[in-house]
Amino acid sequence: MPSLINFDAISSLKSSLHGLSICAFNHLHHVPQHNGSLAHEGPTNQTDYSSRHHESQFSQEAHAEQRSRDDEEANSFEGSCNNSDQSWTSRVTSKKNEAGTESGDASVRRIYVTSIPEEHRHLPSQWFPSNKIRTTKYTPVSFIPKNLWNQFKNIANAFFLFVTLLQCIPLFCPEHLGLSFIPLSVILLTTAIKDGIEDYRRCVLDKKFNNTLTWKLVGFNNANALGEHIGLWRKLKKFISHTVADMSYCLKNSGISSGLATLTVDNISHRHSLESDSAFTLSSVSQDSLEIHEIGNSGPSNSFSVIQEQSTGSSNAKFERVCRKSLLVGDIVKVLADEAIPADLLILSTENSNGVCYVETKNLDGETNLKDKYALCSTKCCKSEYRCSAASFWVECEQPHADLYSLNGVVKAPGAVQSPSESTNGRKIHEEPFSISNVLLCGCTLRNSKWVIGLVLYTGSETRIQKNRGLTPSKRSRITRDLNWTIILNFLLLFAMCLFSGVLRSIYSAQNNSARVFELSKNSNTAPAHGIISIFTSLILFQNLVPISLYITMDIVRSIQSYFIFSDREMYDEKLDCPCSPKSWNISDDLGQIEYIFSDKTGTLTQNIMSFKKCSINGIRYGKSHNEDTCIKKRRNLNYNENLSCKVDLDKKKMLETLSLSDSPNPESITFISSKFVDHLQSNENYIQTEACFEFFKALALCHSVVTDVQDETLIYNAQSPDEEALVKVARDFGFTLLNTKNRRYTIRIRGENKNFRVLDIIPFTSTRKRMSVIIRDEDGIIHLICKGADTVIFPRLSSGQNNIIEKTKKHLASFSSEGFRTLCIARRTIDKQDYLEWKVNFNEANSAIHERNEKVSKVSEMIEQELELLGGTAIEDKLQENVPETIALLAIAGIKLWVLTGDKVETAINIGYSCNLLDPNMTIFRIDANSFGALEEVEAFIRNTLCFNFGYMGTDEEFRFLLKDHSPPSPKHAIVIDGDALNFVLSEQVSFLFLMLCKQCKTVLCCRVSPSQKAAVVALVKKSLNVVTLAIGDGANDVSMIQEADVGVGIKGVEGQAASMSADYAIGQFSFLGRLLLVHGRWDYKRMSQMISFFFYKNVIWTFILFWYQFYNEFDGNYIFDYTYVMLFNLLFTSLPVIIAGCFDQDVDASVSMKNPSLYQRGILGLEWNGKRFWSYMLDGIYQSLVCFGVALFVFKFGDFVSWTGRNIECIEDIGLFISSPTIFVINIFILMNQERLNLISLITWMFSIGVFWIWTFIYSEVGPSYAFHKSASRTCQTFGFWCVTVLTIALCLLPRFSYICLQKLFYPRDIDLLRRRLCAKSDDETSSSSSFATDIEMCEQCNDPLSSKKNSGIVTSVSFDDSNK
């Protein structure tokens, strides 16, 4: 018989738990792990980490390999001028000064590799979080208390908890003590289940993310103070949970394995993470190690190294696979190709000898282009496990923050020992600064590089990607905000009713008569106490006046509405495989009340797919286009030749026949059409122009930061912007093909011959500089600077003697801008070698600065970007997206005002405005720019004069308050164009209200040259000052601020990435989908939500006031006229489903009619579906119907007798309650059904279900229920003819006034929707099916006095314009 007890396993378990208890003791007492005592999580077999800095020297071979140079070329010239992005300096500082300046700087993070310097050991310990990500709100232990706490933060839930607790006191509610908890429990349980499911999904994603495997260097010393500082209670919980889990694991496996000898403290602490990944075991960790062969140091000969000559590495150091959650600050990790970056890493070395690698940041900022990153010169030698473990240095960097594009720090390493005369403490400290270009951020993916070794700088919650999460502000819809005041009014009404009941109860109790004394044995001395008790009893009785389930019902309805938006195939983009994705489910009704839309231009109104169309070279203009140019000329009523298209096609054909040097794989895709340019490029007669064309296109092929890649034998360009890609592609199409950009060498095939250029420096583009420059050295050793940028920054930097070409180029660029093209200038200069070396020293010093590095680099860059030679200018077309003009026309008819906020030039924005129907030739355009108005007072005077002479306003506060209430469409004859500098003036408090007054009189507002912060400021100004619902739409990272500021943010998934769509409330594929999102789903959702909330208050009022009227009949003693189960199930089963169905499915007209008649949307802008008038109309209707329901039953019982079929009189309170509750349930459900705009099968089914459930419950409960008084009540009352008479009479009297009013209103005072539906009903199905998708054949009825608007170019016709008297 086999043994049932494994004694070896038990023995091993004892020793393991003993070690675990020691670890827990140290953990609970917070023993810091310094200088080799590395206590961290991870399933690795750790060696002795107590070893210090080794004193043995490298072998001669390793030393020679460390000092190897990049190549002979770098040795001859670049020894004194390093890569600009990786510049470094060495400085000598004393240990005394070093310690003195760093003693207590909390703004600096220090990370030590291998050991802590002696002078730093007195510094306070720094605690770092683990790399474990936790986005869940709850844990299994904290879920119930924390979720309940969050739910009871809602004042309504807290109120109902108080009422429920009151019901537990027999003095206030002597019966049904247990049942009182059911309604609140159902609400809390439903919400808890929803929150639990959402949190479980987050937990699954967290677990998957945390258990992703990565390569980590083990067997070396991580000398930092590790782990996050957590409280004693959390440590105790972790200790208990880990102990229980590990014991269960050990007992589970004790019969399978021979023992648990390999179970140690280190791998116990992470047993959970190991078990969660089926492909990851302890054995696989030890076997799945990674060998890295040493590669020689690529640093320059004069650079310092973090590996000292007397240092030696650990022979036990090796890279092993671990879970990413076990990474700690100070760990060294290796990332392989196509792997995700597990933490924020400082790049130590790469596979490339020059230290470059490429990353994709799509998961971080949504951009799909590759970005180049660089290893530090001092750490390029760390290419193997041995060398990484031998390195000794420390890093000083910024504390964690959320900026994705900024990170400054410095690497410091001890140098050689000096004599006392040279230094105070005889220590030389080497420093090399680094920036964001040397850091790999968590969330990026390594591309086009075999491997990268990095040092962990930030982990877990301190990484950039985590710092940028959760920044989206919590938004609430306007209805939700208004609903808070409605709830407050209901609370006040409830308290007034309770106080009224208490006063009358005390009055009734004060009456001394024989009946009261005989029946109650009470006298008037207890009257005040009865009044106080009655107040609390009434609070329990009338609690449904404040709807307990309203908020959860709204969440359910909004979730279903969001699903409908997601499932709409008309908003599905097949090219991007992108549906409309709602990310904020609680603001869907705001989509139906948008009055102002703020839109970006590039990538939002346009496709962000750049096409090179025209250029100016040496004062000669090239290029023809008939796409957007034709459209703009037509809209501006300019002279347009209909034969232009044919001429362009013939010119293209002639060009392709002549062109023989292009390396374009598909010549038909060429967008730059100019046979004259090809003739000049290939001409042997006009040498000067031929050379100019040659140098211009060579500059296009060299001045960029494009990364080349080959996929399936196809050359791919990965550019940081679509503009750069367009420039490089057009150079390729005309024989200047960029073949390779690796190792900072550009290989270009020019006329069939490969040319190599060494990239010495790249001065990147910034929004402040508005230009970028590349410094290159050609094969002849000549150094060139090529610069491209805006004309406003290039022209001032040109050398003298170019007046003729400058004037011609300016005219050409102005012409290009007037045609809607994006323009750039291209310039160059040849630099003397000695001048470059002197500039390089200053540039290195600027790059080495720890503080204000960007400003210093920009200042030094100005020194070399001077005396430029103008080569020419470019014109790039950004085509409009599909149906943009038609969508803008629809939105304008709907009464929505569209403002365009763009960073483009004024001329470009104006012409895009013409092309997309924002502007027309008959408009008067008010231009406000800093060139014309240089001071705030001048801008204010201009706006006041414009308001006075054009619109008759004096700019007073009274006029502004009047305009706040005016939501009518502005004049179609005026528009405003303002630039970013002038916008700073109008955003001031002194001028802002005048600017808004002027904007309300203009159809279109174009804000040009604006920054992201200015975009957000404009949105905030309109939203807060005008008290309107705003929407912002964009596609780039620069649009995130205004998207988050607006009431509704919409992001477009485009070429610029997904930064906007990730921060938005709704993500769509193209701008044209916005029309359907607002005019169909927005209008539906707003109308449905308003109707649902009105129904909710109505049904609760009618039910509550029946109980209130009954109190007059029984002297306010707080008794129910219904059976208590009816009170409990009223909101849960009897009336809830019809309200939810109405909020989800009701619609007045279908989607196609909504799109054809955008003017229907104006009711949402005016707030006509939900306002105080509508609320009180439903409240008063409910009060009236409650009086009818109670009064009819009271009347018939007072003057008549009811006898059951058994001959028994029907006169008990339970029977009378059934006489009242039955018609009440009928009335409520019929009222909801008949107030819906359209009846459908789902509505009828839910209506029958609600009525059926009421009667099923009534019969079952009256037959088998525990209530003696209610026993057989259903069978007694329902078999009497009088019961049904009372029911029919009550229904008729309740519903007759409401539906009489509706009929009269539709006949004599029809709204626009009534006229439209009447017309639709009169039309045949054949006529309806023959209508087009963009034009409606719905004609105006003769009853409406407002005319139809004129047809637009797209064929869109408005339907009925609103007559204010009918609203």
UniProtKB/Swiss-Prot annotation:
The active site is at D600. Residues 77-92 have a biased composition (Polar residues). Residues 34-104 are annotated as: Disordered. Its EC number is 7.6.2.1. The record marks I548 as: Involved in the release of the transported lipid into the cytosolic leaflet. Residues 50-70 have a biased composition (Basic and acidic residues). The keyword Secreted does not apply. Its cofactor is Mg(2+). It is an enzyme of class 7 (translocase). Signal peptide: none annotated. GO terms for molecular function: ATP binding; ATP hydrolysis activity; ATPase-coupled intramembrane lipid transporter activity; glycosylceramide flippase activity; magnesium ion binding; phosphatidylcholine flippase activity; phosphatidylcholine floppase activity; phosphatidylethanolamine flippase activity. Mg(2+) binds at D600, T602, D1035, D1039. Residues 173-177, 504-531, 1113-1124, 1198-1212, 1262-1276 are lumenal. Residues 1-154, 198-482, 553-1091, 1146-1174, 1234-1240, 1298-1367 are cytoplasmic. ATP binds at residues 600-602, 724, 765, 767, 770, 788, 822-823, 902-904, 1009, 1015, 1038-1039. It catalyses: ATP + H2O + phospholipidSide 1 = ADP + phosphate + phospholipidSide 2; a 1,2-diacyl-sn-glycero-3-phosphoethanolamine(out) + ATP + H2O = a 1,2-diacyl-sn-glycero-3-phosphoethanolamine(in) + ADP + phosphate + H(+); a 1,2-diacyl-sn-glycero-3-phosphocholine(out) + ATP + H2O = a 1,2-diacyl-sn-glycero-3-phosphocholine(in) + ADP + phosphate + H(+); a beta-D-glucosyl-(1<->1')-N-acylsphing-4-enine(out) + ATP + H2O = a beta-D-glucosyl-(1<->1')-N-acylsphing-4-enine(in) + ADP + phosphate + H(+). GO terms for cellular component: endoplasmic reticulum; endoplasmic reticulum membrane; phospholipid-translocating ATPase complex; plasma membrane. It is found in: Cell membrane; Endoplasmic reticulum membrane. Belongs to the cation transport ATPase (P-type) (TC 3.A.3) family. Type IV subfamily. PANTHER family: PHOSPHOLIPID-TRANSPORTING ATPASE C4F10.16C, PROBABLE PHOSPHOLIPID-TRANSPORTING ATPASE. Catalytic component of a P4-ATPase flippase complex which catalyzes the hydrolysis of ATP coupled to the transport of glucosylceramide, phosphatidylcholine, phosphatidylethanolamine, and small amounts of phosphatidylserine from the lumenal to the cytosolic leaflet of the cell membrane and ensures the maintenance of asymmetric distribution of phospholipids. This is Phospholipid-transporting ATPase C4F10.16c.
